[in-house]
């Protein structure tokens, strides 16, 4: 219950109550086949969060880590979970929760890739998929479960998912899960796990809901917190275009595309109806466009994401569903057709463009009514969003 006083972080990029910082994967006392998987995945040296968080997690400590998209946080808990799993025990030992199906599948893929040389089984237990697949996986003794709160709780309550051997419970994007209607389900899952279960909580921000979990369920957690001022991604150039009125946005978008050469872009809108409107308008102008939102069937969403990753679709239009955790490597441009209704989602949207040092550009369409919100975003992240220069095309040359 040692989370007292975690409210505002005043100094330093990382503030922690844990002193060990490890600068090489080889020095983390990991299983050789995990290190092999890490290097095979493309990592060379640990990121700041990995240098600080992997060791206490693998030691079995409860950990509260604040890190935004693009810092290597998924690999942080993936590596740690793979290290703690007993490969010879065919029972679920690690449970990872994520707010969306897409993020859960992304995490599963990272576990599979880094765990390539281990005999560890992993399963995604998510809504929108066949329940019989879930039941079969749990009966076979899957060792790591990645899931969304509703489906996971259902599997536990139906007694297909036996939790008695679970030793790690990891919550990714905890701020999003706890603020979007999952709180009661997550609390119920907590209560159905062994009391000795290690808790690892990762969150881009630290709202009261997250701090409450640390006091209720965590035992003297190691705290690794990123200063709020630093919660903007380096390498992302941020601009705005004052479009004055909503009605002028589409013409502005077409003009923008006339002046730049972009491999792929993600465009964010705030509503499903706006996504559909913009998709239809762009198709009328002969753009190759895909659209994704929460109301699409899971299979259709998977197909759309696959097409976009392969490059057969050049523009992906999305609601905030996509704004957390989908790693689309080749995206160089993010356009906020609408500023996010929740300023805490801004970082997840623009983080799509330049992960792990890859450069990216974020362009915000701002009506006269949006100027105040944009200033709030600047203040919240201690960042500056500059007016888009006339020679914007030079950034994409």
UniProtKB/Swiss-Prot annotation:
Keywords: ATP-binding, Cytoplasm, Helicase, Hydrolase, Initiation factor, Nucleotide-binding, Protein biosynthesis, RNA-binding
Location in the cell: Cytoplasm
Pfam families: DEAD, Helicase_C
Residue intervals of the Helicase ATP-binding domain: 54-224
PROSITE patterns assigned: DEAD_ATP_HELICASE, HELICASE_ATP_BIND_1, HELICASE_CTER, Q_MOTIF
Root EC class: hydrolase
Residue interval(s) of motif DEAD box: 172-175
Substrates-to-products reaction catalysed: ATP + H2O = ADP + phosphate + H(+)
EC number: 3.6.4.13
Any one GO molecular-function label of the UniProt entry: ATP binding
Protein family according to the UniProt entry: Belongs to the DEAD box helicase family. eIF4A subfamily.
Domain notes: The Q motif is unique to and characteristic of the DEAD box family of RNA helicases and controls ATP binding and hydrolysis.
Function of the protein: ATP-dependent RNA helicase which is a subunit of the eIF4F complex involved in cap recognition and is required for mRNA binding to ribosome. In the current model of translation initiation, eIF4A unwinds RNA secondary structures in the 5'-UTR of mRNAs which is necessary to allow efficient binding of the small ribosomal subunit, and subsequent scanning for the initiator codon.
The protein's name: ATP-dependent RNA helicase eIF4A
Biological source species: Candida albicans (strain SC5314 / ATCC MYA-2876)
The gene coding this protein: TIF1
